[in-house]
Structure formats: structure tokens, C-alpha cells
Amino acid sequence: MKYSIEDLIQIMNDLRDKCPWDKKQTLKSLKSLTIEETYELIEAIDKEDYYEIKEELGDLLLHVVFYSKIASEKNHFNFDDVVESLIKKLIYRHPHIYSDVKALTWKDSYF
């Protein structure tokens, strides 16, 4: 079976509703775990272990979804808002792709 980001968001909703540990987490309680996952990703990159890179990227994606869920419970923002904000930032930072501005070198295109 192939899963989607919507499945991940639904699983996070289920975990926040039904799992005592997940229910208890806050933005602050997840910080050290996020740092740990980031270091694990860096180690996997240093080893060029693509399987581990994939796994650690998944762990970080889980954290993005987790933080978004916690924020949505407090009516601040949700995962879709995070995606929209990122897309707007990428478009803004790449006018040489999304407008008439021309970048002559890679340095011209680096925000």
C-alpha cells in the first residue's frame, strides 16, 4: 500500500487523540527530540547512507507535522499553512524562476 502526506496527518490526528505520550507533548517538549533527529540526519549524510537519510528525513517530517498539529490545536496555524508559507518564500527567493528577473550566475540566484 502506498501512503500519502494526508495519511501522515491523519495518523498524527489519531496519535494526538488516542496516545497518552503524544497527547502530552508540547512545542517545548519536542525541541530536544527534534535536535536529536537533526543530528541523526547529519550523521547519515556524512556516511552517505541513503537509507538512513530517508529514515531521518521521515523523522524530521514527523516533527514538522507534530509541531503543526500542536499549533493548530491552539488555532495558530496548521500543516497546510506551513506548506503555503514555504511555497511563498521559495517563490519570493527565486524571482529568476518565477518572474522576469534574470540570474546570470548561481551567485545571482542565491538569496
PLM regions: where:
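Flexible "arm" and connector segments at domain edges
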Residues: 1-56, 62-111
